Swiss-Prot record:
GO CC terms: photosystem I; photosystem II; plasma membrane-derived thylakoid membrane
Organism whose genome encodes this protein: Fischerella muscicola
Gene that encodes the chain: pcb
GO biological process: photosynthetic electron transport chain
Obligatory cofactor(s): chlorophyll a; chlorophyll b
Transmembrane domains' residue ranges: 31-51, 68-88, 93-113, 222-242, 256-276, 292-312
Keyword terms: Chlorophyll, Chromophore, Membrane, Photosynthesis, Photosystem I, Photosystem II, Stress response, Thylakoid, Transmembrane, Transmembrane helix
GO molecular function, one term: chlorophyll binding
Cofactor note (record): Chlorophyll a. Chlorophyll b.
Coiled coil, from the record: none
Name by which UniProt lists this protein: Chlorophyll a/b light-harvesting protein Pcb
Membrane topology of the entry: Multi-pass membrane protein
Length: 324
């Protein structure tokens, strides 16, 4: 099937690098390979930048003054820091960086395998692999794939919970030290009130970014991790209802991409508020008092993703009108 690049920057060109993954839109196996290879690139970036920051880290100088990008996140998770947020051991950072580099190699190899050795279309593999072949207008199969993604995200949320509660704890800026979170908040009224901006019976424009204690942070991750895993199981077993498909049509890849970009934009905007105003999640010891530059970057990325949503949503309507 020919891939149309009409109304894109790749229109009227035969340059494969400019057309990008649009060439693979109907090749489920090769698109999976590109997906895995992309994850490998992200892992490689994380690992290489972490190692680079370890090599140039200067003890006694705050991380934010050294323009660190990833080490503050690791320090926030309680790795290598002691009282007052002082870095007492950079070896955990080095190990984490190496693990990411190893993971990037594995993912890169997996991506190359699916591109060059595996069938271009998963259905042709047969067996269990064929179960993951999809058509863009098959909501049941897309629900199967979505479900597995949600379960993985849920496990990711619980990794933070395990680190905070059982494996060394995380950094608490309010006591300026690392501690175990032994009593996370389970009360649904407390946790879900943040979604509508209710904090201590008062409304705040900050919404969930108004959280000011790690018990609520970890309790929220327990809730969201559970919801993600249960939601993943639901989507694996139950196809989207007809009324859902009317609100969020599932007809082509452009629609799926537009929904993903809209979710990404939402996460970026929420992250920007957290970065700018929340010292509990972004301790000033590691990120500094003034984080306007970091927050602005998050806003710009969110706006870019939102523009992408409108672009691909329009592309989807164009494709649907051509089909009709």
């Amino acid at each position: 099937m020919a891939i149309s690049t009409d109304k894109t920057f790749a229109a009227n060109t035969n340059s494969p690098w400019l057309i990008g993954n649009a060439r693979l839109i109907d090749l489920s196996g090769q698109l999976l390979g590109a997906h895995i290879a992309h994850a490998g690139l992200i892992m490689f970036w994380a690992g290489s930048i972490t190692i680079s920051e370890v090599t140039r880290f200067v003890p006694g100088i705050p991380m934010y003054e050294q323009q660190m990008t990833l080490l503050p996140h690791l320090a926030t998770l309680g790795w290598g820091v002691g009282a007052g947020g002082e870095v007492i051991n950079t070896y955990p950072y080095f190990v984490i960086g190496i693990l990411h580099l190893v993971a990037s190699a594995v993912l890169g190899a997996g991506g190359l395998f699916h591109v060059f050795r595996s069938p271009a279309i998963l259905y042709n593999s047969g067996g269990q692999v064929a179960k993951f072949h999809y058509e863009w207008n098959d909501p049941k199969k897309l629900g199967l794939i979505l479900g597995h993604h949600l379960i993985i995200l849920g496990f990711g949320a619980f990794l933070l919970v395990l680190k905070a509660m059982f494996f060394g704890g995380i950094y608490d800026t309010h006591i300026e030290n690392v501690r175990l979170i032994t009593n996370p908040t389970f009360d649904p009224m407390t946790i879900f009130s943040y979604l509508v901006g209710i904090k201590d019976s008062h409304w705040t424009l900050l919404g969930i970014a108004s959280v000011d204690n790690l018990e609520d942070v970890i309790g929220g991750h327990i809730w969201i991790g559970s919801i993600l895993i249960l939601g993943g199981i639901w989507h694996i077993l139950v196809p989207p209802f007809a009324w859902v498909r009317q609100i969020l049509p599932i007809v082509n890849g452009e629609e799926i991409l537009s929904y993903s970009l809209l979710g990404l934009a939402l996460m970026a905007f929420i992250s920007a508020v957290f970065v700018g105003y929340n010292d509990t999640v972004f301790p000033k010891e590691f990120y500094g008092e003034n984080r306007i530059v970091i927050a602005t970057i998050q806003w710009v990325l969110g706006i870019l993703a939102l523009v992408g949503y409108f672009w691909h949503s329009w592309r989807s309507r164009e494709l649907n009108s051509n089909l009709s």
